[in-house]
Amino acid sequence: MERLELPFELRQKSRLRARLASGEEVRLMLARGTVMRGGDVVTTIDGREVEIVAAKEKLLHIESDHLARVAYHLGNRHVPVQVGHGFLRIAEDHVLEDLALQLGARVSHIQAPFEPEAGAYGHHHE
């Protein structure tokens, strides 16, 4: 099965033209509101199945003894947040990095796949 590596920004699009690892162009037309996750299998317009790979992105990895407080403040800014066991991840942003540091968090710059929460009313794609 072919694989299609995409950053989070492109995995949110319902209409997409992209290139497979082989260099071949494919087109996707998904239901509005669909967010593709790493490991999802989608069908291209021409009927082929393609596995979605979450691309590595520049992220802020945030740890804190008061993680709920940091999450609350990030949530007030309506930014996508990946919630893990003992950490939060957000796209690199110097303003939000400063905010997290002011709240006493430990922040590191990493490159990793970004899989933020879908939200209370987000579409869950299986």
Regions picked out by a protein language model, each given a short descriptive name:
Residues 25, 80, 106:
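Residue-level detector of anion-binding/catalytic polar loops
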Residues 5, 11-77, 89:
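Compact, glycine-rich, soluble single-domain proteins
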Residues 1, 10-13, 20-22, 90-126:
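Helix-rich terminal scaffold detector
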